[in-house]
Amino acid sequence: MRPVFEWNLGARSLLLGKRTLIMGVLNVTPDSFSDGGIHFHPDDAVEFALHMLQEGADIIDVGGESTRPGATVLGTAAAGAEAGQEHAAAKTPVSESEELQRVLPVIRALKQKRPECVISVDTYRSNVARAAIEAGAEIVNDISGFRWDPQMKKTIAELRCGAVLMHMRGRPEEWRSLPPVTDMFMLVKRELREWADAATVAGIKRDRIVLDPGFGFGKNFEQNYPLLQRFQEFHELRYPLLAGVSRKSFIGRALARNGKDAPVSGRLLGTVAAEAALVLKGAQIIRTHEVRACRDAARVADIAVM
């Protein structure tokens, strides 16, 4: 039986656990590893968001900065993250003002067209988080676990919005040189507990927090699968759980042929298999690029966990 939670977003709440909620990924970036920037223009982004809602998305996650390999985060080049492109060239960092220019028009337009839509903003910057919530978003999804911007925890507490706390091991520029870990699952579980405790101490109410173990972020092929295999044990932390595995490199590696990882375009079935497994292991929210396929898989998997 999957745990049931009420996720407090401020003006309303979402029931988590009765059925799997689908978070559709909307990258408003020119260099996303998954879609190549095809939704970079605000009108295109809003149109695609509406399409995802029609396909069954419960939440639209709007992001204005790429975390693909070679993207630069906080002025540092990421290496070997999601798409498995080990030697991608570093990109110019996205400024705060540019990130705002990317996400705010999309959030405002989407909220105007679909006022009932639940929107999250994928950012590690507190000023972007505040502006996005004021524009109509209700959730802050922070890949840094509220750690990179010292004002983020205080900002989320003041905004009284929903929040996703994701685990990332080290910083992107450190990923190639991280020391070996004997038990990646226990490391992630321990740090998620510590970071969630720090968030509540800073004033973020417990019922506003969802945890994400951060598949692919500072974890290699051999380290991601234990997180999937033991995912249900994260419920011992007593928070609702979100998982995002869509199109990631550890899926491409598992689908390798003739010594070559499956390309991003060839990871659909592997993605859906991993997402269904996560639902069966208790994930309340799945973050995905494949909304229709994930929704259908989750509907069937939900029956097994009820």
State where each predicted segment sits.
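SAM-dependent methyltransferases
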Residues: 1-19
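Active-site-adjacent loop and "lid" segments of alpha/beta metabolic enzymes
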Residues: 2, 9-10, 34-51, 67-80, ...
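N-terminal binding-site loop/beta-alpha segment at the start of enzyme catalytic domains
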Residues: 15-43
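N-terminal glycine-rich anion-binding loops that anchor highly charged ligand groups
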Residues: 16-25, 51-64
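Conserved, well-structured ligand/cofactor-binding cores
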Residues: 22, 27, 32, 61, ...
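Hydrophobic "anchor" residues on beta-strands that sit immediately upstream
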Residues: 23, 57, 118, 138, ...
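Phosphate/pyrophosphate-binding loops at sites that engage ATP/ADP/AMP, CoA/4′-phosphopantetheine
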Residues: 54, 58, 195-208
